[in-house]
């Protein structure tokens, strides 16, 4: 079946690449996300796909506020019991907040990567590998010490 051959990363995006940033609107952001992913996950499972990775699609068809609302509630994606991929590296949700550029967004990227890891992200999509690895190692250490307490 398809599940034996294909793995799927499923990313949320409102609209198309051509219009996704033109006034994105959600009545209830989290509810709409969970309905979207529940349907898509079921469709893939019905096709026999076993390995599915969820990606909230930070920066794709979302306002600055939408992106931060998603990050604030990231742990709630755990209800799907699937790996969660987060890609915020140098995204406008960081540099627009500070009025800087993508090249100046490393510190913000590292902070949000760390927050994402603490809130359940399993995979990070990054530009700056060394810094991301440091975040992963620090969070793994923190979690290992917490588990021993």
Show which residues each predicted segment covers.
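Conserved, mostly hydrophobic/aromatic
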Residues: 54, 116, 128
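A short acidic, helix-capping loop that chelates divalent metal ions and anchors anionic groups
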Residues: 16-23, 93-98
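Non-cysteine beta-strand/loop elements that form the S-adenosyl-L-methionine
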Residues: 7-15, 56, 82-89
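Active-site glycine- and acidic-residue-rich loops that bind
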Residues: 26-36, 58-74
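Short, small-residue-biased leader/transition segments that mark boundaries at the very start
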Residues: 1-6
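Hydrophobic residues within beta-strands of alpha/beta enzymes
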Residues: 8, 52, 124-125
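C-terminal helical cap(s) of enzyme catalytic domains, especially alpha/beta-barrels
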Residues: 126-149
């Amino acid at each position: 079946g398809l599940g034996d051959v294909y793995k799927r990363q499923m990313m949320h995006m409102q609209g198309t690449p051509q219009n996704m940033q033109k006034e994105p609107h959600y009545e209830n952001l989290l509810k709409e996300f969970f309905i979207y992913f529940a349907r898509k996950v079921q469709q893939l499972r019905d096709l026999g796909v076993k390995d599915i990775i969820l990606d909230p699609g930070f920066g794709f068809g979302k306002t600055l506020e939408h992106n931060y609302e998603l990050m604030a509630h990231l742990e709630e994606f755990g209800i799907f019991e699937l790996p969660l991929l987060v890609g915020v590296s140098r995204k406008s949700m960081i540099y627009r907040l500070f009025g800087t550029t993508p090249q100046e967004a490393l510190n913000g990227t590292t902070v949000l990567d760390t927050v994402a890891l603490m809130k359940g992200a399993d995979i990070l999509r990054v530009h700056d590998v060394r810094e991301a690895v440091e975040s992963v190692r620090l969070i793994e250490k923190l979690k290992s010490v917490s588990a021993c307490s």
